[in-house]
Amino acid sequence: MKFRIIYSFLSATLLLPFLGYAQQWGPPDLQVEEESYEKQDDPYLPNAYNNQKLSPAYRYDGRSGSRTSNTEIFTRQVNVSPSHKNILGDAANEPSIAVNPLNESEIVIGWRQFDNVNSNFRQAGWGYSSDGGQTWTFPGAIDPGVFHSDPVLDYDNAGNFYYNSLASQHPTEEYPCYVYKSGDAGVSWNNGVYMGGGDKQWMTIDRSGGMGEGNIYSSWTSYYSHCPPGFFTRSTDGGNSFDSCSILPEDMYWGTQAVGINGELYISGRSIVPGRILVAKSVDAQNPARSPTWTSVSTVELGGYIVYRPDVNPEGI
């Protein structure tokens, strides 16, 4: 299946036809969509054509049509064969991208890799580029044959890449997450470090240059946690180990994190109360000698209600 990337100068956007969330003006039912979680259903199936049936990969070169700029734009397919052809019979979605701050020609993308479109068994697929996205290498999957989902990539200021992924060794094992580290621009990864984790996890890395430089923060859905009741963790040693899971001051799910210029940590997510988006702040999560405390929790009004799986696109992919 074709999986492509568009570049304009040094910015990157991955285009895939999926939409998981939407806003509506009327309040939805007061419920948490607990059916939305990752679990192993189908068995693994190898590619039906042994990755030998190929077609031309997607490729585009052009310029923007803006009246105020004349910017070069190019598109390249990422999940390609060694001969840079499209592989028939596989599929990919939920991409996450990271760029090396020390060398912007080095780019890594991770995604959910389906080797066979007749099975929803997914793996931790990835590809890397060393020439700014012009050409790509697709080695396959981290942990081949192991169920993975929810890929999240980030990088630190030293040029290391990190791949956070839910991983289950067998169908009854649900929601454990591991963080994999690459020191060679995505060519290879370590064996991964268990971080606790859970469904719909996200990750960010402190690049503020302060006390928390290199800290890794992650949170996930509380009611699908591998270490209940916790749904937050932190690494202060570059992903070599992670703190015991802890709770946040409010139950936030489908969330993300961000680090401020002074190293303060923000976590945002949807509340179980319709129409509420919450933001929690910690100023001491950056301090490796302290357990994070949370100084404030704010409610953000978006002028509507976030709903999941709207009629326009009920599957979200």
Task: Describe the predicted segments one by one.
Residues 1-26:
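Bacterial Sec-dependent N-terminal signal peptides
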